[in-house]
């Protein structure tokens, strides 16, 4: 109803991927289009899986194709990576980066049987991971960021782009950034 197209492919993977596999918290709010927690960090910060309408918006805007390489910065419990992995197929690859070791551990445990999903802990969003391969087809940043770091913008492929909520914490806009 909100105007975002839900393709048959997106609908199928969302129906077939049980949210309960990615969170030990009550998942009922998710079915009412609300975000749900999936873990709490050592510092007491609650990490969430986005509401379904936001996940659909992100997936729609990613323009995913089979065999793509997709980088997701911000784990969202592994749920988003599972959806993306299904949409890009077994010849694609999903690389999940997160700055929180607890979040990476949680997501890895939930996705042990997914051979096309890799995980890596980031020192900081500002610092490129060591020995990180090539140019980027698709980059999805799931948490707000004021501006894209150079290690990302300089490696967007000719046909690639980044989807990210850019701007200050209280005033972000979901943006699509292509190679300049």
Model-derived regions, located:
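Class I SAM-dependent transferase core
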Residues: 1-87, 102-106, 111-113
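Conserved nucleotide-cofactor-binding alpha/beta core module
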Residues: 59, 63-180
């Amino acid at each position: 109803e909100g105007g975002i197209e839900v393709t048959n492919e997106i609908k199928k993977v969302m129906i077939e991927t049980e949210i309960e596999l990615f969170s030990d918290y009550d998942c009922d709010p998710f079915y009412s289009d609300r975000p749900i927690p999936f873990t709490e960090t050592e510092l007491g910060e609650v990490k969430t899986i986005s509401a379904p309408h936001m996940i659909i918006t992100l997936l729609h805007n990613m323009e995913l194709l089979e065999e793509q390489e997709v980088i997701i910065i911000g784990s969202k419990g592994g749920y988003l990576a599972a959806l993306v992995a299904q949409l890009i197929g077994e010849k694609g690859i999903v690389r999940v980066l997160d700055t929180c070791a607890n979040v990476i551990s949680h997501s890895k445990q939930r996705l042990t049987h997914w051979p096309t999903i890799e995980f890596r802990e980031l020192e900081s969003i500002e610092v490129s991971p060591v020995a990180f391969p090539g140019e980027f087809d698709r980059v999805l940043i799931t948490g707000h960021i004021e501006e894209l770091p150079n290690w990302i913008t300089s490696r967007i492929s000719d046909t690639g782009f980044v989807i990210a909520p850019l701007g200050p914490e209280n005033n972000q806009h979901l943006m699509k950034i292509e190679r300049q």
